[in-house]
Structures are given as structure tokens and as C-alpha cells.
Amino acid sequence: MTEAFQKFIISLGFLPLKEEIVLSKEISQAVIRRMPRYYRYLGELLDEGVERISSNDLSRRMKVTASQIRQDLNNFGGFGQQGYGYNVQFLYEEIGKIMGLNTEHKIIIIGAGNLGQALANYVKFEKLGFRITALFDVNPQLKGKTVRDIPILMLSELDDYCKTHDVDIAALTMPKSKADSIAQKLVDLGIKAIWNFAHVDLEVADKDVVIESVHLSDSLMQLSYNIVKNSQK
């Protein structure tokens, strides 16, 4: 890249091409948990036709400090240019790459009850690159049914399905009594990550398998605490 062209790229709010995203360094989970929020706000800015934004303007929208934004993004090399700010489209795409959204991830759901079917009905997952390919259950009355054209299969079919389909993520929406054994089975079948909605903290033998536990009642308890706190002011 010539120096003149590099300056032109920078003038548009892009980084020089030598600035590559490096994920080898350890990034705190607190930073990782904030990245989807940046991605969401940047998507809204694109919908509004905003082409560039300063860290101060972004901080006002997100109700966080500008220094927090700069520190978070600097973990990945930084994306802004002094006097210009951030190119919204570029930053949106780069955060998408950081979060792995430039690759399709196939998901299966274990448990086709109310929660499992609600997840299968959430179409926005597909827009983010997450495609639910099947649900599994032990209830024979659900066999052969579909949720948004996604088939419900019997749990006994899980082994064969995973061996013939390239599944990345399994969502567990089943009773906690069976969750541990099913989780280990999924790991043995090559699942890379488990999205755990069962009311149990899972442990599996393979430490490279990512487990993200979602306890829905935890959020309600936090709301309850804040209601009590506010009532005491």
C-alpha cells in the first residue's frame, strides 16, 4: 500500500490494512459481554443512515463513558481515527467478525417444550448467522412436527443426526435432572458450545467446549432487588 493511498483510507475513517484483528490475547469476559451491545447500537446507526460517529456521541447514545468505548475497542487494535471518529459501517463489520458473525453457526435445541419452541421461532437469530436446524425431545407426540419448518426429532435420533450434520451449538432447554448427561453426550458428539437454559451449572470433561448458562430468573431477582432498593430511598 502506498503512503498516499494509506492516507486516503485513513481519511475515510478506516484503519490501514496492516492493522489486523488479533484474538490471540486474552480478552476479559466483561469486554466480550459488551461487544454485542456495540454491535446492536452500530446497527441502529446504520439504519438511521449515520456514516461516522465520535466516541463521545456513541457514549451518549449508549450511556457509557467515551474512555470505556476506546478502551474496549483498543483490545482489538482500535478502529477510530483522531479528528474523524469511527466509520460506522467498518466498525459494525469488524465487530461482527470479532464475534464470529461472518460465519454461519448451526444450532440444535434439546427440549422442544415452550422455551425450546420459542427459541426456534425467534427469526432474528438467522440474521445474525445462527441457523437452528433441528429440535429434539422425548415426547413421542411431538415426533414429525415442525416449528417454522424446523423439524422436531426424537432424542434417540441425536447421535445419528450429529454424525451427519455439522452442528456447532446445542441449546439445552430441558429439565436439569438430565442436563449433565446430555451435555457430556453432546460434547462426545463434537458439539463446540452449549447454550444452557437448564437450571444447573454444567461441567463437561472437555474444557475447550464453551458453556454459556442463561438463568432467566436471575434477571427477575435483580429487578426485584432494585425495586426494593428504590422503595427505600
Report each predicted region and the residues it spans:
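Glycine-rich Rossmann-fold phosphate-binding loop(s) that bind the pyrophosphate
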Residues: 112
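HTH-adjacent hinge/linker in prokaryotic transcriptional regulators
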Residues: 52, 56, 61-104
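NAD(P)-binding Rossmann-fold cofactor-contacting core
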Residues: 128-148
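Phosphate-bearing ligand-interacting subdomains
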Residues: 43-47, 150-233
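Hydrophobic/small residue at the entry helix of a nucleotide-binding pocket
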Residues: 115
